[in-house]
């Protein structure tokens, strides 16, 4: 049984790497993307999603969490290009200045619970400061936010969430380095 989830900022290579893991370890690739799970969002850019009414975003965040739970909850072996860490980080980014802390805590607790139940290995693609100037973002469908400072911010929030959740989680950091394409232990 291998249930592998990837986390990291948009355009860093999660889907590409998840497909490589799926191929090399004969695991089924499962897309966890909002665009896949919520087809009405397929043509909406990330920037436009972030401009939506905060109440609408709040409802969609819970809807996406539920859809990921339904998709991954009964699978014994898979690799996916998204994780509950992604959900937690984007929720903090979008909602922390609008929702009471107890609402944010509740959402993060749900994400942590689902991650612990449905993930054996979390691979995080970090976005350290040195990458801001030189990183070339993949964006085949022109839907991503291209501002590298935004992507760096999201990666930072993910690191903070992991710190909040504590060391009991089993995860790996996969930093952008020479080891980028080395296969993880699965």
Describe each region flagged by the PLM.
Residues 9:
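P-loop (Walker A) phosphate-binding loop of NTP-binding proteins
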Residues 94-162, 172:
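A glycine- and Lys/Arg-enriched "phosphate-lid" helix/loop adjacent to the NTP-binding pocket
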Residues 14:
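Conserved lysine of the Walker
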Residues 19, 23-67:
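Conserved substrate/cofactor phosphate-moiety recognition/catalytic segment
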Residues 57-116:
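Glycine-rich phosphate-binding loop used to anchor ATP phosphates in small-molecule kinases
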Residues 160-186:
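Charged phosphate-binding loop/patch that engages nucleotide di/tri-phosphates or the phosphate backbone
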Residues 1-3:
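Pre-Walker A (Motif I) flank of P-loop NTPase domains
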Residues 6:
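Hydrophobic anchor at the beta1->P-loop junction of P-loop NTPases
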